[in-house]
């Protein structure tokens, strides 16, 4: 695990090449076909060195949940183990890792009619009014969910309207945890400013590789929009808005880099509270040796 641009892929490839391992991607952007540059998807050369499972498994118009990931990952883990190999799960989508390790609550599926109803209420009265509703039905979730987070706010209210139970109540019951012994590692630079520099450098490389053209091709399909999970991935939203003329090129770069740094900050916040985690420093010599020693 680790924040974006921390060197997870390079270490995973080294591990796969030198030991009897197969890689499973744990990344909510890499699942989408046609989103290669902006998601920092491993190159063809890297995939030849170490194939990644759960990459390119969905169209950007499709949804993919943590429950979908857990089911897919469990199947891949079982298959890799049956081949006499060790699964290596690599990525930065902490919600996926958490779902896999701890199990998931039996939440109801999305209801498009109720979602539309909630959106109409938000359009009429504002998200603050809906947040007040959430405080009445689920004060614990209301403490965690900010009024400016419409996706999570809408989902919490939707769950209550479908089931008659609060999100807090339902999340207290979870499916069985992962039935395997897991050794967990996180990799990140020692200093945050180093990570920030790496993020900026990587985004500039993405632009040189043709990221704007990639987003333009996705936009030209006509069936994608900014409310889809795929198009909410960092970088894609900002580039889409630039192509829509909402701001100039320099502002797009600034906003995309800032959004990526915010993502890295959230990832690090998750990791700092993660139990039983072994830390590695990005770029440090001997990371693979340290990792293998901890796995014995």
Curated annotation (Swiss-Prot):
It comes from the Bacteria. Belongs to the IPP transferase family. Its cofactor is Mg(2+). The record marks 93, 115 as: Interaction with substrate tRNA. Substrate binds at residues 4-9. The gene is miaA. Keywords: ATP-binding, Magnesium, Nucleotide-binding, Transferase, tRNA processing. Monomer. ATP binds at residues 2-9. The keyword ATP-binding applies. GO terms for biological process: tRNA modification. It is an enzyme of class 2 (transferase). Catalyzes the transfer of a dimethylallyl group onto the adenine at position 37 in tRNAs that read codons beginning with uridine, leading to the formation of N6-(dimethylallyl)adenosine (i(6)A). Its EC number is 2.5.1.75. Transmembrane segments: none annotated. Pfam families: IPPT. One of its GO terms (molecular function) is tRNA dimethylallyltransferase activity. Residues 27-30, 151-155, 232-237 are annotated as: Interaction with substrate tRNA. This is tRNA dimethylallyltransferase. It catalyses: adenosine(37) in tRNA + dimethylallyl diphosphate = N(6)-dimethylallyladenosine(37) in tRNA + diphosphate.
């Amino acid at each position: 695990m680790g924040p974006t641009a921390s060197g997870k892929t390079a270490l995973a490839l080294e591990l796969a090449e030198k030991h009897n391992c197969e890689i499973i991607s744990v990344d909510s952007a890499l699942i989408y076909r046609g989103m290669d540059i902006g998601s920092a998807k491993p190159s063809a050369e890297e995939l030849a060195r170490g194939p990644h499972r759960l990459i390119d498994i969905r169209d950007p118009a499709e949804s993919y949940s943590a429950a979908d990931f857990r089911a897919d990952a469990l199947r891949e883990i079982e298959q890799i183990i049956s081949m006499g190999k060790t699964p290596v799960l690599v990525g930065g989508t902490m919600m996926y890792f958490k779902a896999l390790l701890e199990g998931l609550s039996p939440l109801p599926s999305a209801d498009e009619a109720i979602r539309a109803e909630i959106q109409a209420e938000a359009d009429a009265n504002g998200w603050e009014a809906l947040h007040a509703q959430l405080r009445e039905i689920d004060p614990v979730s209301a403490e965690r969910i900010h009024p400016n987070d419409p996706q999570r706010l809408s989902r919490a209210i939707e769950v209550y309207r479908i089931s008659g139970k609060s999100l807090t109540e339902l999340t207290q019951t979870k499916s069985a945890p992962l039935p395997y012994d897991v050794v967990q590692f996180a990799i990140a630079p020692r200093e945050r400013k180093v990570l920030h520099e790496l993020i900026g450098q990587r985004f500039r490389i993405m632009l040189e590789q043709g990221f704007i053209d990639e987003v333009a091709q996705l936009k030209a399909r006509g069936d994608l929009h900014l409310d889809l999970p795929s198009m909410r991935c960092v970088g894609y939203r900002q580039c889409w808005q630039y192509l829509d003329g909402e701001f100039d090129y320099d502002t797009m770069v600034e906003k995309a880099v800032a959004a990526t740094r915010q993502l890295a900050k959230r990832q690090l916040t998750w990791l700092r509270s993660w139990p039983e985690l072994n830390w590695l420093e990005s770029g440090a010599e001997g990371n693979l040796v340290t990792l293998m020693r901890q796995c014995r």
